[in-house]
Amino acid sequence: MFIKGRAPRAPPRERRRATRGGLRQVVAPPRALGSTSRPHFRRASVCRRRCRKSGGLLAASRKMAAAAVNGAAGFSSSGPAATSGAVLQAATGMYEQLKGEWNRKSPNLSKCGEELGRLKLVLLELNFLPTTGTKLTKQQLILARDILEIGAQWSILRKDIPSFERYMAQLKCYYFDYKEQLPESAYMHQLLGLNLLFLLSQNRVAEFHTELERLPAKDIQTNVYIKHPVSLEQYLMEGSYNKVFLAKGNIPAESYTFFIDILLDTIRDEIAGCIEKAYEKILFTEATRILFFNTPKKMTDYAKKRGWVLGPNNYYSFASQQQKPEDTTIPSTELAKQVIEYARQLEMIV
């Protein structure tokens, strides 16, 4: 006899279990007559539990793969501190590889550039540009500074001026803002002097003096790396171009040659422009001396670059570039009339 309503639970002896597709299925007894209940199955819930379990294993395997890519054996739940330590350790290892290649007698510049590119990506994880909201350890700051210093020197060897300017803009933070927290770098004054020479070679005199004001007076007067560009700026203001050319012989470091050559080329162009205006013709040997060339071949190459033609008498002629006589005639009659009229008006005022 059945009672209307929910189907009663079947006795244990009447339950049946079946295994289909490796999943356990529990089947309820037939519903009671007139009952509105439906047989229920546990197959869906079992599937959901197994899916959740397999999904958790998949997520764990993904974490382990990501950790392996980052250089770790597995994943850890110790928090951001452990992650930062792992990144710092990886950056230190990559820096040692870069340093080893850079300190070779003839470093591979392409390989160094690739290492610098990878290191900058790693440094981004460490917030290598300090801000007010970040707290970096002394080890992290020194590591980032050393990498940027190699990058600045690498840019000089590659003759990449924009890259050098970017590296110096980043290094100034470590040289000035953190000078109390960090020990002084052995390359600080050399790179700051290079930056001054760079600004001078680009004729950015205002920025040159702005950077100079950030340095102590003692360094300006005594440090050999800073004194050199300061002396060059004084020679340029005096018009003593011969002293500028002589200064190339006593550069404080080999890296200064790159910007010195740019500065000397600019000065030569200015002198050559004045020669074209002031001389109708000039002797080959005299032009070589005025333009501070030490070999005739360099003078010949520069003359071809300027479009100068050497005549049979060993003279460079600039007659075609001189102003025409009518263009240089002084209107003396008109000037005299204006002066007389001006004097007459002064007498009327008195």
UniProtKB/Swiss-Prot annotation:
One example of a Gene Ontology biological process annotation: proteasome-mediated ubiquitin-dependent protein catabolic process
Residue ranges of domain PCI in the record: 162-331
This protein's UniProt keywords: Isopeptide bond, Phosphoprotein, Proteasome, Ubl conjugation
Cross-link (Glycyl lysine isopeptide (Lys-Gly) (interchain with G-Cter in SUMO2)): 297
Region (Disordered): 1-24
InterPro entries listed in its UniProt record: 26S_Psome_Rpn12, CSN8_PSD8_EIF3K, PCI_dom
Statement: the UniProt record of this protein carries the keyword Phosphoprotein: yes
Protein name per Swiss-Prot or TrEMBL: 26S proteasome non-ATPase regulatory subunit 8
Organism: Homo sapiens
Lineage of origin: Eukaryota, Metazoa, Chordata, Craniata, Vertebrata
